[in-house]
């Protein structure tokens, strides 16, 4: 009996403890009902990952911080990929392999078209509450793929030649307002010194800036269906570039730039390069006086024509930074909300790095103020405004990325003296024709 009594007592104690624990657990749940909305929001918070090519410190981090503060239920994380061949491969691999990518920036139309064909970019026509054409203007159409928007262009693409104004003044040269590659070489010869190159072009743009403006009008394919990449304007442009590298030697050869990983922006801002064919993205370093101190003023000139008679010349520009939504994203609606906000002014923190919003509803005066910042006295503002206010005819490269790669391969063989100009043109035309036959 004694043993039985002890067992009963122990059982009662256990039941009592369990009951108390259960009661406390229920009370805790009930009492935290209101707090649960704040202490357990993670169940309702949507997390988006935004991939872009701009360094976080150059504006993107401030952008997502501003968004996240105002939108606690939709939190965005920025992932930077370098906008070069390896960086774009990294993004494409992430898209195809199902890594966390909800929104991604495209910097050339051929790369966007490639991502559309792979099923990575969402057709934005399903969203009807935002008129891309109305907001961005007629230039937006250049980013349409098969007459549909798979990405929203968000900034004005502005390409021009950065010039050392002090060096120009010393040489008695005016800031050009309309010039040719022959003029560029003349300027480069006058500005070249033992410690300073005269002129350079970003390797990434070396095969498209010079002559694609004309081919965009003439067409990359002739009426008979064969390649037009052998047009006379192409040969002339290649010859001019080659001569500046190897004959007058006013430009660093492509091989030198790539083998030494020459930082052309640093070369220009360090007074080791007098003229740089680039674009608005250089502002993010030009305004960085800590890492790139300089004691000279910068002026701006339009991109050079190949010849003065080039009546069909178009300027590389239009709109850029086309943001797309991953077709496999689980949060397409939330990503779209972010895109609209970003385009209409959310992206302004990047204006200090040269990215001017394209949307008519973004504050353009604020963008220019941010662009110049505290460095206004370091620029020839008159020449900059001439570039910004010029309503020049522009184009976007529409060649498939594979053909662009073919051209670059063949052009580089010419630039490094491993094949003649005639062989280069013949090879490009043949490979382009072969590509079209495969397609």
Q: Residue ranges of each PLM-predicted region?
A:
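Short, low-complexity disordered leader/linker segments with a strong preference
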Residues: 1-48, 69, 426, 430-439
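Short, solvent-exposed loop/beta-turn-alpha elements that line the ligand-binding surface or hinge
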Residues: 40, 123-135, 177, 217-237, ...
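Extracytoplasmic "Venus flytrap"/periplasmic binding protein-like
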Residues: 66-136, 170-172, 267, 271-275, ...
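Extracytoplasmic/periplasmic substrate-recognition and gating elements
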Residues: 69, 75-77, 171, 243, ...
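Helix-loop-helix "hinge/cap" segment bordering the ligand-binding cleft or interdomain interface
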Residues: 69, 75-76, 144-207, 218-256, ...
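A structural signal for short loop-to-beta-strand junctions that line the ligand-binding cleft
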Residues: 92-93, 101-102, 131-167, 195-198, ...
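Hinge/lid segment of periplasmic solute-binding proteins
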Residues: 107-158, 212, 297-301
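Long, aromatic- and glycine/proline-rich binding clefts that accommodate carbohydrate-like moieties
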Residues: 142, 352-409, 413
């Amino acid at each position: 009996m004694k043993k039985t009594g002890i067992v009963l007592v122990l059982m009662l104690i256990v039941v009592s403890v369990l009951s108390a624990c259960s009661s406390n657990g229920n009370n805790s749940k009930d009492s935290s009902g209101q707090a649960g909305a704040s202490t357990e929001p993670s169940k309702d918070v949507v997390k988006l990952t935004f991939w872009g090519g701009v360094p976080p410190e150059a504006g993107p981090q401030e952008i997502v911080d501003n968004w996240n503060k105002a939108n606690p239920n939709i939190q965005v994380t920025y992932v930077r990929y370098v906008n070069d061949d390896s960086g774009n491969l990294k993004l494409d691999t992430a898209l195809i392999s199902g890594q966390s990518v909800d929104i991604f920036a495209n910097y050339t139309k051929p790369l966007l078209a490639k991502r559309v064909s792979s099923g990575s970019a969402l057709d934005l026509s399903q969203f009807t509450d935002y008129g891309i054409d109305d907001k961005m203007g007629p230039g937006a159409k250049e980013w349409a793929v098969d007459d549909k928007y798979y990405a929203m262009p968000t900034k004005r693409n502005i390409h021009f030649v950065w010039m050392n104004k002090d060096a120009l003044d010393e040489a008695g040269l005016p800031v050009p307002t309309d010039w040719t590659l022959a003029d560029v070489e003349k300027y480069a010869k006058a500005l070249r010194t033992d410690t300073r190159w005269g002129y350079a072009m970003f390797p990434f743009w070396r095969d498209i800036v010079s002559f694609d403006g004309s081919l965009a009008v003439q067409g990359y394919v002739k009426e008979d269906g064969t390649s037009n990449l052998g047009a006379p304007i192409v040969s002339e442009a290649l010859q001019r570039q080659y001569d500046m590298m190897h004959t007058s030697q006013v430009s660093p050869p492509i091989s030198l730039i790539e083998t030494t990983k020459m930082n052309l922006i640093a070369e220009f801002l360090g007074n080791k390069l007098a003229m740089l064919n680039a674009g608005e993205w250089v502002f993010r370093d030009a305004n960085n006086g800590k890492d790139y101190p300089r004691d000279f003023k910068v002026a701006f000139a339009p991109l050079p024509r190949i010849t003065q008679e080039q009546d069909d010349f178009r300027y590389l520009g239009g709109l850029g930074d086309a943001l797309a939504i991953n077709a496999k994203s689980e949060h397409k609606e939330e990503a779209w909300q972010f895109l609209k906000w970003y385009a209409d002014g959310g992206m302004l923190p990047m204006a200090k790095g040269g990215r001017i919003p394209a949307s008519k509803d973004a504050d353009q005066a604020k963008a220019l103020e941010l662009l110049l910042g505290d460095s206004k006295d370091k620029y020839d503002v008159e020449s900059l405004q001439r570039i910004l206010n010029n309503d020049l005819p522009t184009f976007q490269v529409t060649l498939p990325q594979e053909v662009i790669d073919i051209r670059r391969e063949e052009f580089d063989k010419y630039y490094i003296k491993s094949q003649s100009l005639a062989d280069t043109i013949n090879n490009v035309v043949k490979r382009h024709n072969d590509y079209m036959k495969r397609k």
